[in-house]
């Protein structure tokens, strides 16, 4: 075709021909200017080609721009055959590897930051997973730190645990054997909360009692499930009156550990003792899958203190008047037996790990928007259906956005400010219409704002606090948006500068909780009264924290997780505005800072966040009636 008399020609064979010639030149060593030395094997190539394929090598070559000869790059931890596969891919775009080489190709692609190959290899490994390879594949993916694949493998394990439990790799895993004392004719509850209690017991044993995980696995541990739903060892039974005094002594002989456990309950009027507050280490604790083997026997695959292991639970009924047996309990255990048609499993994770995300409840669904992970700020928005335990995508935001909060106003979702990954502060905002599934812009803030608190009150949208353009100190600013006039105005400033606060409406007032003034985390709390446009300090929290989440339940505030300047937190506290008092309540199963926290129905959900080591896509739920957090959900079988 010759538009306007000029020649325009595209040779469709040129690229394919040139690529083949380039690869031939590489193999013959012609015009090569880089040598890869992989475990003693030398491979020649062209820097320009490798730099286009591998960001890792691009950085090396770019920093060595003055080199006039052949560059030398050494790798002592890669398989030469796998690197040769990647070289062929770089020159031909074709990826060919035998099945037993795919893991090594994946490792090499991860090292060289060739993400497309890494993803293809990972998906291939998942497609080949079976009962025999499930554990070894999980160990490999866990070592690689690929949480996308790890989620898929864990989902497979949940569906095939009994088959996997018969394989050699599973049988070689370390095992924690627990024998749980039960009243006669009472079975272990078919309830995922039991495993959460087991994790809490192991954590107490290690962190408070100085136990070693290996030592706990050396012998069968006898525990007691109390009538008030606590899982205790013998050293804790002295606090419970359900067992006879002589029986307590018998049990304590089997478990001589000292009991330093204190309930995490305190009010703002008193101090919280250091020994009472458990700081969660930066290690992984999670339940992967569980199955019922027999009437009173359960099998569970878990990660305890970053160790993949098996938990074997056996409930033992105590015979009446049998002095040689475990003591008979004097009160029937009030265990939660699930209906026959119910199924309890770990809640489905989000499709993306997210920290600094916005969450809200909309039409009975949990909405999780934006946030960031190790790679980027996100535009995607996910919707969780509590009844089906399924995450689905809705329309993405127009702007990648993290370090922001989200609110519901007039049945629309509003997001304002935050960071897009390139500029620390955004002034733009947008709203989501669930009927049209469309995001539309809203008038920009009067100034850029990141790490601010957002909530709705009396038909208006409030943006409170945030960080300055340099991200080094908090702001006192408070702006309010009227959706009818589409105008921003100022209201009274905060008493204390705050960024990364938790903000929530309760009782026709706004509470701004914690945050940081500069780098120092705050435990102070302020309350805004719109009638007189004033901020007033109220009782401080027990724990200073920034990046926490907050939700309302039963006329109280629940402040969840966060960061205390040293650790990501799992501890949670509740504020009673009538008594102006804070108290510690049940801790989460995972430490989470910058998580999304939202009330849906009569429960509170914590989604995503950062645990001090990894970005999270997991979800857990708090039941105010039992004061417990759990990663499990209960579904009805169809």
From Swiss-Prot:
Annotated ranges, domain BTB: 32-99
Pfam families given in the database record: BACK, BTB, Kelch_1, Kelch_KLHDC2_KLHL20_DRC7
Cellular compartments per GO CC: Cul3-RING ubiquitin ligase complex; cytoplasm; cytoskeleton; nucleus
Ranges occupied by Kelch repeats: 365-411, 412-459, 461-508, 509-555, 557-602, 604-638
GO biological process, one term: proteasome-mediated ubiquitin-dependent protein catabolic process
Region (Disordered): 251-273
Stretches assigned to the BACK domain: 134-233
Keywords annotated in UniProt: Cytoplasm, Cytoskeleton, Kelch repeat, Nucleus, Repeat
GO molecular function: ubiquitin-like ligase-substrate adaptor activity
Its biological purpose: Plays a role in cell division and in the dynamic organization of the actin skeleton as a stabilizer of actin filaments by association with F-actin through Kelch repeats.
UniProt-recorded name of the protein: Influenza virus NS1A-binding protein homolog
Naturally occurring in which organism (per UniProt): Xenopus laevis
């Amino acid at each position: 075709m010759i538009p306007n008399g000029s020649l325009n020609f595209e040779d469709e064979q040129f690229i394919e021909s040139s690529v083949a010639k380039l690869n031939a030149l590489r193999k013959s060593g012609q015009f090569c200017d880089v040598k890869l030395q992989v475990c003693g094997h030398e491979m020649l190539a062209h820097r320009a080609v490798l730099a286009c394929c591998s960001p890792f090598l691009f950085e090396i070559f770019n920093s060595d721009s003055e080199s006039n000869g052949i560059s030398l790059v050494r790798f002592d931890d890669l398989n030469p055959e796998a690197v040769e596969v990647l070289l062929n891919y770089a020159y031909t775009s074709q990826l060919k590897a035998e099945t037993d080489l795919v893991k090594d190709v994946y490792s090499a692609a991860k090292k060289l930051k060739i993400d497309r190959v890494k993803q293809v290899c990972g998906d291939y490994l998942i497609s080949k997973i079976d009962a025999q390879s499930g554990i070894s594949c999980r160990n490999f993916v866990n070592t690689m730190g690929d949480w996308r694949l790890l989620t898929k493998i864990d989902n497979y394990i949940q569906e095939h645990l009994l088959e996997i439990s018969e394989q050699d790799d599973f049988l070689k895993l370390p095992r924690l054997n627990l024998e749980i004392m039960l009243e006669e004719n009472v079975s272990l509850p078919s309830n995922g909360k039991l495993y959460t209690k087991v994790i809490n017991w192991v954590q107490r044993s290690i962190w408070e009692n100085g136990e070693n995980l290996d030592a706990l696995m050396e012998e069968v541990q006898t525990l007691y499930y109390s009538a008030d739903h606590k899982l205790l060892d013998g050293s804790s039974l002295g606090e419970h009156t359900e067992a006879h005094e002589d029986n307590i002594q018998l049990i304590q002989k089997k478990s001589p550990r000292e009991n330093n456990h204190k309930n995490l309950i305190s009010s703002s009027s008193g101090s919280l003792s250091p020994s009472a507050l458990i700081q969660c280490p930066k290690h992984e604790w999670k339940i992967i899958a569980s199955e019922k083997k027999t009437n009173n026997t359960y099998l569970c695959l878990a990660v305890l203190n970053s160790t993949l292991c098996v938990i074997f639970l056996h409930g033992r009924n105590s015979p009446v008047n049998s002095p040689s047996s475990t003591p008979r309990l004097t009160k029937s255990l009030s265990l939660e037996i699930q209906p026959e048609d119910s199924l309890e499993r770990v809640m489905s994770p989000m499709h993306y790990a997210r920290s600094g995300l916005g969450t809200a409840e909309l039409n009975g669904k949990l909405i999780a928007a934006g946030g960031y992970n190790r790679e980027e700020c996100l535009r995607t928005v996910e919707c969780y259906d509590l009844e089906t335990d399924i995450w689905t995508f809705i329309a993405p935001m127009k702007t990648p956005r993290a370090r922001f909060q989200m609110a519901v106003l007039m049945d629309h979702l509003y997001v304002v400010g935050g960071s897009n990954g390139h500029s620390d502060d955004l002034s733009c905002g947008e709203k989501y219409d669930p009927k049209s599934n469309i995001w539309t812009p809203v008038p920009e803030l009067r100034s850029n704002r990141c790490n601010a608190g957002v909530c709705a009150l009396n038909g208006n949208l409030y943006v409170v606090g945030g960080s300055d353009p340099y991200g080094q100190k908090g702001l006192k600013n408070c702006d309010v948006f009227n959706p009818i006039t589409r105008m921003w105005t100022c209201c009274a400033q905060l008493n204390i500068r705050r960024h990364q606060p938790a903000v929530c409406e309760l009782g026709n007032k706004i509470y701004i909780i914690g945050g940081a003034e500069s780098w120092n985390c705050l435990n102070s709390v302020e309350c805004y009264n719109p009638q007189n446009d004033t901020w007033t300090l109220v009782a401080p929290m027990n724990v200073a924290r920034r990046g926490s989440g907050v939700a309302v339940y039963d006329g109280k505030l629940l402040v969840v997780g966060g960061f205390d300047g040293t650790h990501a937190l799992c501890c949670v506290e509740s504020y009673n505005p009538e008594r102006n008092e804070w108290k510690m309540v049940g801790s989460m199963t995972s430490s989470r800072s910058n998580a999304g926290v939202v009330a849906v129905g009569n429960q509170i959900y914590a989604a995503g966040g950062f645990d001090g080591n990894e970005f999270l896509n997991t979800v857990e739920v708090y039941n105010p009636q039992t004061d417990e957090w759990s990663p499990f959900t209960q579904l009805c079988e169809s």
